Amino acid sequence: MQEAYKAIADPTRRRILKYLRGGERTAGELAEYAKVGRTALSHHLMVLKLANLVRVERRGQFQVYSLNTTVFQDLLTEITDWLGGKNESSETSIIEDEAITHSDQVSDAL
């Protein structure tokens, strides 16, 4: 999952992913939309493929890219869990975190 976080940290890759939300795209379409050269696009697509965020399928002379929505669902679940879970309000999580921090500070002072 770490590769996915690194991949989406880059604004060009996020732009590519956003464009792929509209459906399958060829490498040429992606390069034009992202306003990057073929070499830079190749690098970005490799990072996205290694993170398993996009799928690629060869169709004749073209490579067609699409989103791997399963990985995005896993990322969303992981982030939701990290932020405090689906059934827990964020306000409650923040209060609990502050209570733990305060408790640790009191223990350190003793």
Q: Where are the language model's segments positioned?
A:
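Short stretches within intrinsically disordered, low-complexity N-terminal or propeptide regions
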Residues: 42, 53, 101-103
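Short, hydrophobic-biased segments on the C-terminal half of alpha helices
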Residues: 45-46
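Single-residue recognition of alpha-helix boundary sites
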Residues: 24, 55, 79-80
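N-terminal helix-turn-helix DNA-binding core of bacterial DNA-binding proteins
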Residues: 2-40, 61-72
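Amphipathic alpha-helical dimerization/coiled-coil segments
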Residues: 69, 73-110
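Extended rod-forming repeat segments used as scaffolds/tethers
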Residues: 17, 50-51, 104
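Beta-hairpin "wing" of winged helix-turn-helix
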Residues: 49-59, 66
